[in-house]
Structure formats: C-alpha cells, structure tokens
From Swiss-Prot:
This is Fe/S biogenesis protein NfuA. SUPFAM superfamilies: Fe-S cluster assembly (FSCA) domain-like, HesB-like domain. Its cofactor is [4Fe-4S] cluster. [4Fe-4S] cluster binds at residues 149, 152. Keywords: 4Fe-4S, Iron, Iron-sulfur, Metal-binding. Disulfide bonds: none annotated. Involved in iron-sulfur cluster biogenesis. Binds a 4Fe-4S cluster, can transfer this cluster to apoproteins, and thereby intervenes in the maturation of Fe/S proteins. Could also act as a scaffold/chaperone for damaged Fe/S proteins. Pfam families: Fe-S_biosyn (PF01521), NifU (PF01106). The keyword 4Fe-4S applies. GO terms for biological process: iron-sulfur cluster assembly; protein maturation. The keyword Metal-binding applies.
Amino acid sequence: MIRISDAAQAHFAKLLANQKEGTQIRVFVINPGTPNAECGVSYCPPDAVEATDTALKFDLLTAYVDELSAPYLEDAEIDFVTDQLGSQLTLKAPNAKMRKVADDAPLMERVEYALQSQINPQLAGHGGRVSLMEITDEGYAILQFGGGCNGCSMVDVTLKEGIEKQLLNEFPELKGVRDLTEHQRGEHSYY
C-alpha cells in the first residue's frame, strides 16, 4: 500500500524518539476521492489506534492508516530528500484524488481517471481543468474546459498537442478528442 524509504523511516524514528512511548505515525487523506484531497502524516499515540486501522509495519516504525483513507493511499510513497537547499519530507499519493481504476474498467472510467490523475494536475498550475462529458459511439472523447482554460488562446494547442496525444497514446480505442466548451474570454482566462 505505502512505501516509506529508509531515509524517511530514519527521519520519522528520530522524531518519534521524542514522543510518548509507543507513539507511531498515521498517514491519512482528507477529502479522499475529490479534487481537494490532501494527504498528511501525524503522530499516532497508542490510544489513537482504531480497531479498523490498517497497521503497516516497517523496520523502524509502524504506520497506521484509517479505513477510509486506505484505498486512496494505494501506491503512495513517502521519502526524505536532501539537496543543496536542505531536506524535506515528500508524500506522493497518485490515487488520493481518485481511486485507481482496473485495466479492464469501461473506457469512460479509464479516460476519466487519466484526466483526473495526469492531465488536470498539469492544468491546475494555470487554474484550469478539463472534464469528460461523454465518449461518442464513433470513439471521440468530448471534453469541457473550465477555470483558466475557458477562453484561453492556447486551448486548441493544449487540446490537440497535449491532451489528445496523451489520451490516444494511452487509449488506442479512441479516435480523438473534441472540445464542447463555449469559450468566454475573460479575466479568468490564463492567456
């Protein structure tokens, strides 16, 4: 479920040494399965462990995960990275905002997952997002842009050179993508 690097385990062990005896860590997701999902790590004293928690035993510590967060922390990684500027703890949870779908799931679900997990995080840097409205019988993914993408002069390039290429590469059964958005240029538009 969660991989914690040796460096991160050593970092946590050092922090836990200053806590009450038996204290471990808890890894959790707030608002799991939503675009606002946020992951976190906190101390978990022995009296805070719930019967429904999953205990993940590592060499230097135990990480507890609550029942609701568990599916969203699948494939999560915690690392402790040191560079010229200092060191920091990183937590990558690719499924926090949306549960990973099975390879044999319907095309609509697989495309939606790709949009939410791969494409929207890139568009979010410009305050934008894209939603899958439908997949036509002819095999076209009909998309709607929102936020900073609505009315942006670069939306055609983003659609054809970015999103379409990525989706066609990942889903050969698609014929292409089409934009359903009625673009309204305004202050919200990125370019």
